[in-house]
């Protein structure tokens, strides 16, 4: 879709349920995210500097500027949107002015064109300017191909890059857990996930503590902040006999509700049915 909104996601989610598709088989992405995944899967020589996309799918020309923060791992990708206006009767001269405005003080090495506005072979002087030191590509299926890359690569546990747009969550949330005597991080939420209608949950056994520590890390940084959530009035039980469920409800790109539920430990220690709720804004 052109723009992801909560209303749009709710509507398409109803369609998903009607088609009996699982949440893993379903993803709503906007044009900018499709552009990101399409460009980032092109050959390396096109990745030197910024990439630009002129969208002529509607009456108004829109320009998307893609930039990578290569010092982070994974690489963080952001896209800025600029509305350039309507083409005049002299399309070539009008579009030349738009391109000069879009490229002002920017180092752009790759440019894409999509949409019927660029049909007809009218780009002459504007195209000469755009291709001066830049590679340019014209096509109609960039968004659909980008969506295919999204579907394929979001299944991967380790990614080379993460896209942070308006509808993507901006923080990594993890737990430090012990698994087979080894300490490791369990990812509850990964930065770059679409936050609409999303929740994540897991069950863990407490090891002699009445607090839950969430590790928060911004994708731009290396250091993590630890947020300690106290489980007030948690029933006293022997070590490792308290199982809890942690659920994260995403409320926005920087906001989440955390719900922690006491599950007890089977018939030996029944659940107290206590629930602790926290709201976190980053």
Label for each model-derived stretch:
Residues 1-7, 101-128, 139:
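Glycine-rich phosphate-binding loops at beta-strand->alpha-helix junctions
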Residues 7-12, 38-41, 61-66, 119-126:
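A short acidic (Asp/Glu
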Residues 29-43, 136-178:
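Glycine-rich phosphate-binding/hydrolytic loop that grips phosphoryl groups
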């Amino acid at each position: 879709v052109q723009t992801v909104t909560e209303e749009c996601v709710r509507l398409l989610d109803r369609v998903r349920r009607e088609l009996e598709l699982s949440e893993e088989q379903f993803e709503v992405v906007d044009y900018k995210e499709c552009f990101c995944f399409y460009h980032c899967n092109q050959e390396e020589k096109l990745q030197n500097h910024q990439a630009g996309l002129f969208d002529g799918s509607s009456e108004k020309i829109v320009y998307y500027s893609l930039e990578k923060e290569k010092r982070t791992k994974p690489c963080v990708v952001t896209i800025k949107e600029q509305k350039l206006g309507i083409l005049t009767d002299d399309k070539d001269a009008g579009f030349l002015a738009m391109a000069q405005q879009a490229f002002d003080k920017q180092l752009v090495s790759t440019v894409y064109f999509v949409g019927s506005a660029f049909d007809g072979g009218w780009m002459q002087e504007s195209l000469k300017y755009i291709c001066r030191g830049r590679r340019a590509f014209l096509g109609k299926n960039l968004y659909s191909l980008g969506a295919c890359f999204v579907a394929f690569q979001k299944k991967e546990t380790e990614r080379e890059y993460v896209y942070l747009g308006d509808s993507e969550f901006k923080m990594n949330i993890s737990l430090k857990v012990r698994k087979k005597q080894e300490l490791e991080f369990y990812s509850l939420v990964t930065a770059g996930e679409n936050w609409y209608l999303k929740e994540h949950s897991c069950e863990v056994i407490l090891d002699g503590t009445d607090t839950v520590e969430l590790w928060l890390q911004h994708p731009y940084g290396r250091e993590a902040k630890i947020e300690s959530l106290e489980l007030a009035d948690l029933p006293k039980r022997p070590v490792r006999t308290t199982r809890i469920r942690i659920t994260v409800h995403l409320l926005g790109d920087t906001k989440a509700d955390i719900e922690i539920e006491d599950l007890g430990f089977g018939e030996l220690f029944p659940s107290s049915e206590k629930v602790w709720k926290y709201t976190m804004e980053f």
